[in-house]
Amino acid sequence: MPSLSKEAALVHEALVARGLETPLRPPVHEMDNETRKSLIAGHMTEIMQLLNLDLADDSLMETPHRIAKMYVDEIFSGLDYANFPKITLIENKMKVDEMVTVRDITLTSTCEHHFVTIDGKATVAYIPKDSVIGLSKINRIVQFFAQRPQVQERLTQQILIALQTLLGTNNVAVSIDAVHYCVKARGIRDATSATTTTSLGGLFKSSQNTRHEFLRAVRHHN
């Protein structure tokens, strides 16, 4: 893995140790993003031709390149820890020891089984120990892990482990409520169902009062 920020390396190592890292094979060789996009575009051209689409049409001719750019630079950019957000931690000088909650964090991810959209919102809470984190960094961590092929259960746990690792405390909780387009747009084609996943650590798991306070915040969000 190329040189990473200390925070990115710590989070990656923590996820690997817990068996929660996204399934990735070791690269056969290092590849720059432009080469990667060119190869993906070539394979996408073959797929579209197998579907009998006419890539000479001006509406379709750039589609393989658009998809390749979207995969590498956007919706799968979270596969590259070089894109892990810069983290700002602040000493907890005020000795904050109550729950900090961020609600309605929008996320868009991709189902790793069918490569279609997962669209949802996250609620994240933590009880500070020695440090507090810049609030926007929580949103960025959620979005980083969402920008991968995902299953919602793993996504929820990855966000939890990342924040526990960075904040030096187990007292973190994450809940995600999302619509899966592999359910909405294909198969059963259920347009109204949603999936909720929750991952609790520390006091959020062991203390009934703390857990209920978090779940009340989640219900308020819904």
Curated annotation (Swiss-Prot):
Recorded superkingdom: Bacteria
Keywords: Allosteric enzyme, GTP-binding, Hydrolase, Metal-binding, Nucleotide-binding, One-carbon metabolism, Zinc
EC number, as in UniProt: 3.5.4.16
Record entry for activity regulation: Allosteric enzyme. Activity is modulated by K(+), divalent cations, UTP, and tetrahydrobiopterin. Tetrahydrobiopterin is an inhibitor of this enzyme.
GO CC annotation: cytoplasm; cytosol; protein-containing complex
Binding residues annotated for Zn(2+), in chain numbering: C111, H114, C182
Enzyme class: hydrolase
Pathway assignment: Cofactor biosynthesis; 7,8-dihydroneopterin triphosphate biosynthesis; 7,8-dihydroneopterin triphosphate from GTP: step 1/1
Reactions catalysed, as given in the entry: GTP + H2O = 7,8-dihydroneopterin 3'-triphosphate + formate + H(+)
Cross-referenced InterPro entries: GTP-CH-I_C/QueF (IPR043133), GTP-CH-I_N (IPR043134), GTP_CycHdrlase_I (IPR001474), GTP_CycHdrlase_I_CS (IPR018234), GTP_CycHdrlase_I_dom (IPR020602)
GO annotation (BP), single: tetrahydrofolate biosynthetic process
Signal peptide: none
One annotated GO molecular function: GTP binding
Family: Belongs to the GTP cyclohydrolase I family.
PANTHER family: GTP CYCLOHYDROLASE 1, GTP CYCLOHYDROLASE I
Assembly, per entry: Toroid-shaped homodecamer, composed of two pentamers of five dimers.
Annotated protein name in UniProt: GTP cyclohydrolase 1
